Amino acid sequence: EGTSNTRDLGGYVTKNGESTKFHIFLRSDNTNNLTNEDILVLKKYGIKTVIDMRGYKETSKSEDKLSKLDGIKYYNIPIEADNKKMSEFLNGKCDLSDIYLSMMSESQGKTTIKNLFEIIASESEGTILFHCTYGKDRTGILSMLLLGLCGVNEEDIIRDYSIIYDLIKDNKQVQTCY
């Protein structure tokens, strides 16, 4: 009820004919509107770790409802575009793919991605839920990386990313958020 873009990364066929496992990764949008029933469902689903990729401005406006729950480890690892690149984007001098590349390739971006994967590697129990504000850009990047590492074909990765556009097409407030 309280999210519009929460889904499991399980069930994708890999290049070697196997499938990604369910209950390992959930991608999501902001969790600040979760109902008590939503929280119970997520706990039953096996959520043990939450990775919040929103920046300080976003987290200060709306705290992650899962961040203070017993039995759930919460990490805030912001993925943010560098100011120069964001200015170029807003002035039409680059496109969104340039922003994504800068978030992963700049020195700070590389460190952030490394930190994300260190957390993922260290959390061996339960499901990991990761999110940003809309579950679109930053969440899409991490989903793409995880599915790619699992050997999911590119078309399915693109299809997974594109689902958000069907979910938000009527919501004019949803946009790139950072």
Tell me what each language-model feature is.
Residues E1-L129, I141-Y178:
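Cys-dependent protein tyrosine phosphatase-like superfamily
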Residues Y134, R138-T139:
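Ser/Thr-glycine-rich phosphate-binding loops at phosphate-binding pockets of nucleotides
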